[in-house]
Amino acid sequence: NFVGIYGWTTNPLIEYYVAEMGSMTGGTYVNSVDSDGHSYSFYKSYRYNAPSIIGTANFWQYKDTWGSAPTGSNQTVTMSNHINNWSNWGGQGFGSYNYQILALEAWGGRSGSINATVWQQ
């Protein structure tokens, strides 16, 4: 399962995750980035003929994960820290935003819910 930030860029086409809960490993480990009191591991992989926001396509997938579950309220995700790291170390730049959401994703027969308020600082 996954709770965190999910989004896409175009030019280049990149699908990205910042996992605040759940493990999103897989792909090649690139480096780590410190943000909001956590050390996130950055993994990237290349997806071939996979579903995307423009239909079936080839694209990069970036995943930052720290593997623990935050508790309480007012958790912060400073996206600029992740984007700067991806831009510097991803090898493709970062592209133009298409969309970005706070997401809960469940698989393997699991389900879940979240009560959240999203705000911009």
Q: Residue spans of the language-model regions?
A:
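Extracellular-facing segments of soluble proteins and assemblies that are Gly/Ser/Thr-biased and enriched
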Residues: 1-35
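Surface-exposed beta-strand edges and flanking loops
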Residues: 7, 20, 44, 64, ...
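Polar low-complexity intrinsically disordered regions enriched in Ser/Thr and small residues
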Residues: 7-10, 25, 58, 111-115
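Short, isolated positions in well-ordered beta-strands
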Residues: 37-42
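Beta-sandwich interaction modules
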Residues: 46-94
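Long, compositionally biased interface segments
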Residues: 73-121
